[in-house]
Structure formats: C-alpha cells, structure tokens
Amino acid sequence: MEYVLEVKNSPRHLLKQFTVCDVPLYDICDYNVSRDRCQELGCCFYEGVCYKKAVPIYIHVFSALIVIIAGAFVITIIYRVIQESRKEKAIPVDVALPQKSSEKAELASSSSKLGLKPASPGPPSAGPSMKSDEDKDDVTGTITEAEETED
C-alpha cells in the first residue's frame, strides 16, 4: 500500500493546544509503529497509520473571526480618536480658559484693596460695558501708584 503525503503547514503555535485526532488527518507521524508507540509520540493511530494531530477547520474559522472582530474594534477606536483630534483642531482657540479658584480669590482681594470691581467670571466681551483704552491705562497707572505708597 502506497501513502501519498499531502503538503500541509503545521498548525500555528497558538493553535497547537487545539489539536485533535479528528478525520481528516494529513501528516503522517511515523510508519510501521504500534498503537502504543504512536500515542507515546503524541500522534493519532487511525486505520493502521500513525498521523500527527491536526487543528480542525472550525477552530481556524473561529480564530479568524476573533482576529477580524478585534481588528475592526481597533480600527473603530483609531477612527474615533482621529475624528476627535480633527474636531479639536476645528474649534477656534479664542475661548478663554477658566481660571482656578485661587486665582479668582487673589484677583478679588487685590481689586478690593484698590477699590476696583471684581472681575466677572465670563469672558471679557460678555461684560455690560467695555472700557476704552484710556480707562485701561488709568487703571494701570492707579495700581502702580498704590503699590508705590505701600512700599
């Protein structure tokens, strides 16, 4: 009796733990050995021939599905991160950052010493009246004079 070997790749290392003695078995483990010797080699004895254990097709399909789903998940996450970064770039940087509570307290205490109104929590353009450039200069000059007299 002549045996024709089919060339098949050995199972991947990750799938080797799923090898079983199910038909069809392709790779011959050893010729002219007993059933006991075949089992010692870790092979399957089927119809008088000692075959290497094989990974069933359904295990290959299942592992391929897992890889495809994991890949789709990773691609989705990457796509969302890219979209978020594009949205952040599209938003103008004109929005003022909120001040910390300690900074607000310092501003309020320094303005109360000088007799100024505390700063409003909103953006500068949200105030009811806008000061002209001359008023801003006057305030700056007043603060400088007050600091000189305290020293």
UniProtKB/Swiss-Prot annotation:
The chain crosses the membrane at residues 57-77. Pfam families: TEX29. InterPro entries: TEX29. Keywords: Membrane, Transmembrane, Transmembrane helix. Residues 1-56 are extracellular. One of its GO terms (cellular component) is membrane. It is found in: Membrane. Residues 78-151 are cytoplasmic. The keyword Transmembrane helix applies. This is Testis-expressed protein 29. It comes from Homo sapiens (Human). The gene is TEX29.
